[in-house]
Amino acid sequence: MDIKLKDFEGPLDLLLHLVSKYEVDIYDVPIVEVIEQYLAYIATLQAMRLEVAGEYMLMASQLMLIKSRNLLPKVVESNPIEDDPEMELLSQLEEYRRFKVLSEELANQHQERAKYFSKPKQEVIFEDAILLHDKSVMDLFLTFSQMMSQKQKELSNSQTVIEKEDYRIEDMMIVIERHFNLKKKTTLQEVFADCQTKSEMITLFLAMLELIKLHQITVEQDSNFSQVILRKEEK
């Protein structure tokens, strides 16, 4: 099964997507939380053996530096004019946000003009159509990456688990469907609650995408950071 997720245009685009979920001014976001979400996303891509561009890894190292500085006790700076990497990053994000808004406005104008001169290209955008409440597959993937990061922390504190490599998507689809034997909806947390390995979580996530693709389940999230609900499709 091919994994086709919406690509971000670069690390700043990914960060802006994460920041926008807080619906506050860029300079007011909880930066450590955003950094942890970014790092979880990169770690999940690597766990799924997906290629991660060098620029994303470079940004990850910069974010780890900012995170470590934020977690250290606050002290009076002996050199107040020293560059602040966090403020530099937030300034870059704000500049990128303004640029992106302008680019989208220009693109919309171009599309409006194109309607009068050419027949629009027919496309089926799977990732932006299958989830409800304006959520995309990428939003679901970001939520999953945070869950996997938390699950790995839990597993690392428990007994050693031997990785099993022969999980099958078809089997995991059945596992998910069992959650709907006695009810019409469940949560993402409930679906992944019994996972014991990273491979199991990844295969279960791919099985969920396949069920969505087959219109057997729908995924809902009423607001940013709220529970993700899986609902059985009515026949």
Curated annotation (Swiss-Prot):
GO terms for biological process: cell division; chromosome segregation; DNA replication. Its main location: cytoplasm. InterPro entries: ScpA. Keywords: Cell cycle, Cell division, Chromosome partition, Cytoplasm. Transmembrane segments: none annotated. It holds the Pfam family SMC_ScpA. It is found in: Cytoplasm. One of its GO terms (cellular component) is cytoplasm. Belongs to the ScpA family. HAMAP family: ScpA (MF_01805). Component of a cohesin-like complex composed of ScpA, ScpB and the Smc homodimer, in which ScpA and ScpB bind to the head domain of Smc. The presence of the three proteins is required for the association of the complex with DNA. NCBIfam families: PRK00104.1-2. Participates in chromosomal partition during cell division. May act via the formation of a condensin-like complex containing Smc and ScpB that pull DNA away from mid-cell into both cell halves. This is Segregation and condensation protein A. It comes from Streptococcus agalactiae serotype V (strain ATCC BAA-611 / 2603 V/R).
